[in-house]
Regions:
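NAD(P)-cofactor binding segment of oxidoreductase domains
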Residues: 85-113
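NAD(P)H-binding glycine-rich loop region in Rossmannoid oxidoreductase-like domains
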Residues: 54-93
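SDR active-site strand-loop-helix element
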Residues: 15, 39, 75-76, 112-118, ...
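Rossmann-fold cofactor-recognition segment
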Residues: 43-56
Length: 229
């Protein structure tokens, strides 16, 4: 893969660098001329990786504080049915860790780029804006809403994404679709306003380069995420 369009020479830490979003973000930022390191439970095939779990907050803190990063990208999350079955862990990963990262970098130049989800909204109202109060109903929805960082230094990006998994056994939509042998059912009168993981990586680099802060619904009707910021 070669997505390079001119480097920015920034230094990133991707927490959760082996996930569906994290590995594409890592590849894109590295190929675009940036210094990219990862934090995950296993080594990334693409970038240097600190082997650790987010439950090990001392190691995570040491990595972030000593790394002199321009931006730390938080890609970790406990999803849907896993959050429902492991509620205390879901609160820790989805709600606590983002604010922990913001707290330990408060007096540093490091920006936290936190990935949230459009699932903080139930979908009942439609046409949600950043000013709407999250009304998601599931435990996952609510823990992700609690984890959102809203301040004038860091940025939270609410996303709905699709992209390749790092493993063939991945459970993402694209992997599932590519494994089907027959026709698959679709939807009518529905609009999906999300983005690919590659487009998300471009959005993240733009936000990091210009130190954009706050809360953004990255639910796009165009392919240019930068215009939305």
């Amino acid at each position: 893969m070669n997505w390079q369009i001119g480097g920015n020479n920034m230094k990133f830490l991707v927490v959760g660098c082996n996930g569906m979003a994290g590995h594409i973000i890592s590849i894109y930022l590295k190929e675009n001329g940036n210094c990219v390191e990862g934090y995950a439970r296993s080594s990334s095939p693409y970038i240097d990786t600190v082997i650790g779990d987010v439950n090990n907050v001392e190691l995570l803190k040491k990595t972030v504080v000593n790394g002199n990063y321009d931006s730390v990208i938080n890609c970790v999350g406990l999803l849907n049915q896993f959050a429902e079955k492991n509620k205390s862990q879901a609160v820790f990963v989805n709600s606590y860790i983002p604010h922990f990262l913001a707290d330990i970098t408060r007096d540093m130049n490091t920006q936290i780029i936190h990935l949230s989800t459009d699932c903080v909204f139930s979908g009942k109202k439609g046409k949600y804006t950043e000013d709407d109060i999250p009304d998601g109903l599931t435990f996952y929805d609510r823990t992700k809403a609690l984890g959102e960082i809203v301040d004038d230094k860091n940025i939270t990006l609410r996303n709905s994404i699709v992209g390749p998994d790092i493993k063939k056994s991945g459970i993402g939509l694209l992997n599932w679709f590519l494994q089907q042998d027959d026709e698959v059912n679709g939807y009518v009168n529905s609009i999906w306003t999300g983005q690919t993981t590659l487009q998300l990586a471009k959005t993240i680099e733009y936000a990091a380069k210009y130190k954009i802060s706050g809360l953004y619904n990255c639910l796009l009707y165009t392919s240019d995420a930068a215009d939305e910021l």
